From Swiss-Prot:
Subcellular location(s) per record: Cytoplasm
Transmembrane parts of this sequence: none
Gene (name only): ureG
Cellular-component GO terms for this entry: cytoplasm
Subunit architecture: Homodimer. UreD, UreF and UreG form a complex that acts as a GTP-hydrolysis-dependent molecular chaperone, activating the urease apoprotein by helping to assemble the nickel containing metallocenter of UreC. The UreE protein probably delivers the nickel.
Role, per record: Facilitates the functional incorporation of the urease nickel metallocenter. This process requires GTP hydrolysis, probably effectuated by UreG.
UniProt cross-references to Gene3D superfamilies, sorted A to Z: P-loop containing nucleotide triphosphate hydrolases
Protein name per UniProt: Urease accessory protein UreG
Sequence similarity: Belongs to the SIMIBI class G3E GTPase family. UreG subfamily.
Amino acid sequence: MSDHHGPLRVGIGGPVGSGKTALMDLLCKSMRERYDIAAITNDIYTKWDAEFLVRSGSLTPDRIAGVETGGCPHTAIREDASMNLAAVAEMRSKFPGLDLVLIESGGDNLAATFSPELADITIYVIDVAAGDKIPSKGGPGITRSDLLVINKIDLAPYVGASLEKMDTDAKRMRGARPFVMTNLKKSEGLDRIIGFIEEKGGLTPRRSA
C-alpha cells in the first residue's frame, strides 16, 4: 500500500489517557529498524505528545511533528484535515522513502473518526479503567475502526471491570472487525497490533530487524 500513493498512514484515536501516545511510542521503537517511519501528533494548544515522543527517543526529532489543532481536535482529523495533510506532505518531502506515518489524534470522544483522505488504517484505543461498558456504548471509534485496542487489561481487577463482558460486547458491536486486548505498559498484545498493520497495510520490511 505504501508504493502507489506514498507511505501507509495509520490513524490512532481514542479518549484522553487511553494509551494512544504509549502505543505510538511502542510502534515507533518496534518498527523503526524495519521501516522508514514518521510520527505526527495532535494536541489542542500544546505539542506535549510530540515532545514526549522526542524525550522517549521514539524516533529522531526530525521525524516527529506536533500539530496544534486549537478548538475542536476532531475537526483536524476529519472535516478539515489540512493541517495534518500538510504535516504528512512535509514529512514526505524530508523523507521521500517513508513507508509509514503514524498519526495520533487529540483527545477525542467515541464519535471521532479519521478522514479517509488522511488515514488508510484507523486504530481506536480505549482502556479498561474507563469501565467495562465502553464497548457497548458504540460510536464510530468502537464500531468502525479497522482495529479496536482494549488497553490496560491489568487494571481490570482493581476497577471491577469484566474482561469477558468487554470481549462479548466488542464482538457484538464490531462483527467481523478485529480487536485486541493489551497491557501496553508491558507490551502485551503489541505484536498483534504490528501484525495487523503489516498485513492490512501491505507493508514489506526494507531491512531485517
